[in-house]
Amino acid sequence: MYLHATGISPDVEKLAPYWEEESRVLAELHAEGVVKSLFRLNDRPVVYLILEADDVEDARKQVGRLPFVRKGLLRFEFEPVEKLI
């Protein structure tokens, strides 16, 4: 199933020490086909992911591999979506 995930970071100043590992894990998730697309808003600390997972819990588990998420620095809300094309 496909999901749209909205991630918000309440304290972006705390992200810096984890950027390298975050980038590595994101690349892994993309290579595994979990993260299909990643977008960032330019004016706010918000990211959007398009994911493919078995269900919402699987998506949470996969996104939970990200250091920002593990450290509580980025929180996601997940919504199942239907692929039209």
What is the predicted role of each segment?
Residues 1-85:
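Conserved, structured core segments of small domains
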